[in-house]
Regions:
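Cofactor-cradling patches in redox/metallo enzymes
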Residues: 369-379, 383-475, 479
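Short acidic/histidine-rich active-site segments
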Residues: 117-131, 157-163
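Helix-rich catalytic cores of soluble enzyme domains
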Residues: 1-112, 126-146
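Flexible, glycine-rich loop/tail regions that form catalytic "lids" or insertion modules at the edges
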Residues: 138, 144-149, 153-337, 400, ...
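Short N-terminal or domain-adjacent regulatory/targeting segments
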Residues: 17-25, 319-349
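Glycine-rich phosphate/diphosphate-binding loops that line cofactor/substrate pockets in enzymes
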Residues: 35-37, 284-288, 339-353, 397-403
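Short beta-strand/loop segments at the ligand-binding rim of alpha/beta enzyme cores
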Residues: 82-85, 351-354, 430-439
Length: 482
């Protein structure tokens, strides 16, 4: 989230090269079959609102991948050198204010990856217009699918060759992007490759910094977002309904899933499952290819949890760098008054104000939590952020171990009520319910009120895009409490 076009291309290509270099080095694939492995590499990219830039981004990536396949990996078959990629149209740019405008944003972002035939996406994943409000209903999802079908079947888009070939503007922009990307690829290669650039947080730090710049540009008005920081006047939308405009997560869904799993486990052949898991464990222990053993596990009826638990025992659990270890301060985004207030409160407390940022549940969207972490650091707080997919127990245990002054939860999965209830319950059980708790996410107004009644100090949604104001809010809550 937040990657610039050159970062997206260079990080994706360097990662692909890392995979192919490793496959080549381990010798499991015969030399004559290696081009087939190259041909199976596929990418998943983002499509943003900058229409021309995004189209040129994919033409650049297509050209560079062809060069890499030809020169680096000696692939001759043109079919195996194609850039195979799917697209997630940019959910980051969807807005809660005037959400009907998101329909146009989604259309434009889709066009940027389908108009240029030579760099056309092979698969497209469109968000729904109301994803900044909550989880989309089947009707909302259908609306997005219909957009793809109209483009494919009603327009003449698929009837022509690439209409951008011969454009000097496009050619110059692509050449400029190529130079920037090649420079970045060289930096990563000198570092030791993509794995090294992940392990030393080089990639993540840059991504968080780019996202911080984007947030700052929106706050200052340098980047215009219609309905958010410009043209905010609006008539009431007939599409927006706080009570029925999106799916609500059933509070019993977890219990129902556990019940189904128990039924499944009781019906399957336990002996067959045990043998399949043992075979998986042996393959992983010997550092062999685990694919065949994993397929056998699936056929035997092994659950995803059992599969991952088996591998976790051998490999451990990987926690990716968060990218918030260092301040990514953007000077124009610096709120000196908040900084002074936090310093004053830290002096009163005889130690630095400490904030815990938590991502509970299966929600993997981390950019909001990262931006809050960075802004809180810049405001003078000590920040504890351990990444995504944490359990309520892990978050509360960290709050106790770190003696934090405030907890900020980021929940975009739609499970904000159940997860918040569980965390508040655990805080009370551990006698630390006096710690202020704030929650951010795609939270309907009706649920905001419920969460405040539960004891949440403040709820933030996409309409609260000004991080300086959020930090000022944090200072208010902390000063009032301590």
């Amino acid at each position: 989230m937040g990657a610039t076009p050159d970062q997206e291309i260079s990080y994706a290509l360097s990662n692909a090269c890392e995979v192919l270099n490793t496959v080549k080095k381990n010798g499991q694939v015969p030399k004559k079959d290696f081009p087939l492995v190259v041909g199976r590499i596929s990418f998943f990219v983002n499509a943003g609102i900058k229409f021309i830039t995004e189209m040129c981004k994919m033409r650049t990536m297509t050209s560079l991948w062809n060069d890499i396949c030809t020169k680096k990996y000696k692939v001759k078959d043109e079919k195996l050198k194609r850039l195979r990629y799917g697209v997630q149209v940019n959910s980051l740019g969807l807005t809660e204010p005037q959400p009907e405008n998101n329909v146009y944003r989604i259309l434009l972002e889709m066009l940027s990856v389908v108009l240029s035939k030579d760099a056309r996406a092979r698969a497209i994943q469109l968000p729904a217009w109301n994803e900044a409000l909550g989880l989309p209903r089947p009707w909302d999802q259908q609306w997005s699918i219909r957009l793809q079908q109209i483009i494919a079947y009603e327009t003449d888009l698929l009837e022509y060759q690439d209409i951008f070939n011969g454009s000097k503007v496009v050619k110059n922009k692509v050449e400029k992007l190529k130079r920037i990307v090649k420079k970045e690829l060289n930096i990563i290669e000198k570092m030791g490759g993509a794995v090294a650039a992940v392990e030393n947080s080089y990639m993540k730090n840059n991504l968080v910094k780019s996202m911080s710049q984007r947030v700052s540009d929106i706050e200052t008005g340098e980047q215009i977002v219609v309905g958010v920081n410009r043209f905010t006047e609006t008539a009431e939308s007939p599409l927006k309904n706080d009570k029925e405009g999106f799916i609500k997560v059933d509070s019993n869904s977890e219990k129902n899933q556990i019940r189904k799993l128990k039924i499944w486990k009781n019906k399957r052949n336990q002996s067959k499952c045990f043998k399949a898991l043992k075979k998986l464990e042996n393959a992983a222990t010997r550092n062999e290819n685990i694919m065949q053993a994993s397929i056998e596990c699936a056929h035997a009826g092994v659950t995803t949890g059992e599969w991952t638990d088996t591998l976790r025992k051998i490999y451990g659990e990987y926690r990716a760098p968060t990218g918030v270890g260092k301040s990514s301060k953007i000077e124009k985004n610096n709120n000196k008054k908040v900084n002074e207030r936090i310093n004053k409160l830290s002096s009163k407390l005889k130690r630095r104000v400490k904030l815990l940022v938590g991502k509970p549940g299966l929600d993997g969207h981390s950019s909001g939590a990262e931006q809050i972490s960075v802004a809180a650091k810049d405001a003078g707080m000590e920040v504890v952020y351990e990444g995504i997919r944490l359990t309520p127990e892990q978050i509360v245990n960290t709050a106790i171990e770190e003696s934090v002054h405030m907890i900020a939860l980021s929940i975009l999965s739609g499970s904000h009520l159940s997860l918040t209830k569980e965390i508040i319950k655990l805080l009370k059980k551990n006698k630390i319910s006096n710690i202020p708790l704030v929650v951010g996410g795609f939270i309907p107004e009706e649920d905001e009120k419920k969460m405040i009644r539960l004891g949440v100090s403040r709820v933030y949604t996409p309409k609260n895009y000004d991080i300086n104001l959020i930090m000022s809010d944090f200072a208010n809550i902390l000063e009032k409490h301590y």
